[in-house]
Amino acid sequence: FYTDADRQFDIREIDLLLPLIKHYDIVSGFKIERKDSPIRLWMSWIYNAAMRVLFGVAVKDINCAFKLYRKEVLKQMNFLPNVTEGIINAEIFIFARQHHFTVTQVPVHHFPRQAGSPISEVGFLGGLTFINPRVIGRFIKDTVRIAKKVYW
């Protein structure tokens, strides 16, 4: 089981995922009624669209941090070294697609962040929020690395 520690999910909803792991290799949540900032929603849409177009990952919410994996899937993974946490989820779904692992998705409730802060955002100029340029650079770099692994 994988989830974040920022309390944006109700851990009791794992009961929605557990019965499905008997039939699927990966059970992935997708956020309903997202409680994220507009910039984060926009970034997520771009990210999911890019992974769908570039790698055929047809998952509603790749980075939803509420997932259940069969041990066999992760044991077979050959993760790229030093991949950022944001792209590792895509790498898992790309691997699953290539190796014909089964995936299903379950809607899970999403709550405002109660701890920590998103590294993908920087705030300045009177409270305006912008995308952290380092995050964009790492995303592009890691996407190219995954593309090389997949296509070359």
Predicted regions and their residues:
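Acceptor/aglycone-binding surface of glycosyltransferases and processive sugar-polymer synthases
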Residues: 1, 8-86, 113-130, 134
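Hydrophobic helical membrane-anchoring modules
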Residues: 81-152
